[in-house]
Amino acid sequence: ALRDVLDTLIVIPNDRLLQISDKDIKASEAYLKSDEILSNGVKGISGLITQPGVINVDFADVKTILKDAGNAVLGIGRSTGEQRAPNAAQAAISSPLLEATMDGAEGVLITITGSEDLKLQEINEAARVITEKADDNAEIIFGHTIDETLGDAGEVTVVAAGFGPRPNRRVKESSEFENN
């Protein structure tokens, strides 16, 4: 099975399109919407690594969260207004296209993006919205980038992993443990 050879699997089921689409939407339009969401997801993950930031996230951070992590979820939210970052965070973790919630995730990667005028309080509240859903002992990696092209919008990208079966997670042999 595919899961047996992957570190992490993010599933976005096509049948969830019914939840976010008008009941009269044409199938071809629904699949275009699905493709757009997948494209945004790939751009979101690659943007985590390639977009320079105030607090950078690099490939090693992504690897830390996704290595042998089993199932993962990806959420991208965007919002405008006074509480744009917290609202974008809520949108990122509430997407009806996610196969699972991020509740109990053992690893979470968060990137908050906004213009130069994004307030520290907004960033802190957005991070709190997300981390409250994770496991109490989760590894949280945080990034903050500035993108003036967003105007007054804030965008939050979340990758949460480390729940569900993890077939590739290697268990240390007894000889590998250090004697203390």
Indicate where each model-derived feature is located.
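Tubulin/FtsZ superfamily GTPase core signature
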Residues: 1-180
